């Protein structure tokens, strides 16, 4: 068996065109162009690269982009003040705080300053609570992208056994809740799970989100399983790989996401889609 490749780049292209049309319709109806404010602390090259990617994506589909880069010596209070001000700024529809923050900063306190209706990363406790209650509004972008890949490729989820390996609040846990909402029977595994291989082997859908390259190997995956790999790991030679041994698992899985080119491209589109969703939630437009 050779797995079907769940191509994130191709899907992202389709989603981008759909979102572009939705934004144009929103602008025509409301007279408002959706906007995103990115808040970050200077000094992290990876954060700078990500900002450029998001800026380009916004400009491509018609979202106004604001860059709020704070100096490396900024304080917790200054960061919170910036987020608080943006939350009350009617010209800003979405707020994205680059995480993780540098050592010494309290990310929970910072996130709490973001208006939940502007929380396009889906990290505010209010939005996490809605997701847990089965009322998702602003969903974290990475798991939302993974679900989009499954649903758009007509992968059967209802009644299937799904194992999510990883329990982070931004990927593992929300992905488990999204699968549960689609009526899968979900198990969450993690670093302290006994006999991880046997737990994974029971799954019809395997989700890897651990940050450990090659953790999921072919002998751990049942034939015909669907595998979603959220891992992004840079090896010593510069090669980017996932948490799944792609070459081996692709021989026995029925479908698999590659790394790179799988969940990543869709994740960025989910962020931009949340900006439009935020604008709608805020009821912006004519007649305010």
UniProtKB/Swiss-Prot annotation:
One GO process term, biological-process aspect: purine nucleotide biosynthetic process
Catalytic activities: (6R)-5,10-methylene-5,6,7,8-tetrahydrofolate + NADP(+) = (6R)-5,10-methenyltetrahydrofolate + NADPH; (6R)-5,10-methenyltetrahydrofolate + H2O = (6R)-10-formyltetrahydrofolate + H(+)
EC number: 1.5.1.5, 3.5.4.9
Coiled-coil regions, chain positions: none
Keyword Oxidoreductase: yes
Binding site for NADP(+): 166-168, 191, 232
GO molecular function terms noted in the UniProt entry: methenyltetrahydrofolate cyclohydrolase activity; methylenetetrahydrofolate dehydrogenase (NADP+) activity
Keyword annotations of the record: Amino-acid biosynthesis, Histidine biosynthesis, Hydrolase, Methionine biosynthesis, Multifunctional enzyme, NADP, One-carbon metabolism, Oxidoreductase, Purine biosynthesis
Stated role: Catalyzes the oxidation of 5,10-methylenetetrahydrofolate to 5,10-methenyltetrahydrofolate and then the hydrolysis of 5,10-methenyltetrahydrofolate to 10-formyltetrahydrofolate.
Protein family membership: Belongs to the tetrahydrofolate dehydrogenase/cyclohydrolase family.
HAMAP family: THF_DHG_CYH
The protein's name: Bifunctional protein FolD
């Amino acid at each position: 068996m050779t797995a079907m490749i769940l191509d994130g780049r191709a899907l992202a292209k389709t989603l981008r065109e759909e979102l572009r049309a939705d934004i144009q319709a929103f602008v025509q109806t409301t007279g408002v162009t959706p906007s995103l404010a990115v808040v970050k602390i200077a000094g992290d090259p990876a954060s700078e690269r990500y900002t450029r990617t998001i800026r380009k994506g916004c400009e491509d589909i018609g979202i106004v982009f604001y860059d709020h880069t704070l100096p490396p010596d900024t304080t917790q209070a200054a960061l919170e003040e910036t987020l608080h001000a943006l939350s009350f700024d009617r010209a800003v529809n979405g707020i994205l705080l680059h995480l993780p923050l540098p050592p010494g900063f309290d990310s929970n306190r910072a996130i709490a300053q973001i208006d939940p209706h502007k929380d396009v990363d889906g990290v505010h406790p209010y939005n996490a609570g809605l997701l847990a209650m089965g009322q998702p509004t602003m969903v974290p972008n990475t798991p939302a992208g993974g679900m989009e890949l499954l649903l758009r490729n007509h992968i059967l989820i209802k009644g299937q056994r799904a194992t999510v390996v990883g329990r982070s609040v931004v990927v593992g846990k929300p992905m488990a809740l999204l699968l549960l909402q689609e009526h899968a029977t979900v198990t969450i595994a993690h670093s302290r799970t006994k006999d991880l291989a046997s737990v994974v082997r029971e799954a019809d859908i395997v989700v890897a989100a651990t940050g450990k390259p090659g953790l999921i190997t072919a002998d751990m995956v049942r034939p015909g399983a669907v595998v979603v790999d959220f891992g992004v790991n840079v090896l010593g030679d510069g090669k980017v790989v996932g948490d799944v041994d792609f070459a081996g698992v692709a021989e026995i899985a029925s479908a698999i996401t590659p790394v790179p080119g799988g969940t990543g491209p869709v994740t960025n589109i989910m962020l931009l889609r949340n900006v439009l969703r935020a604008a709608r939630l805020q009821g912006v437009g004519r007649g305010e």
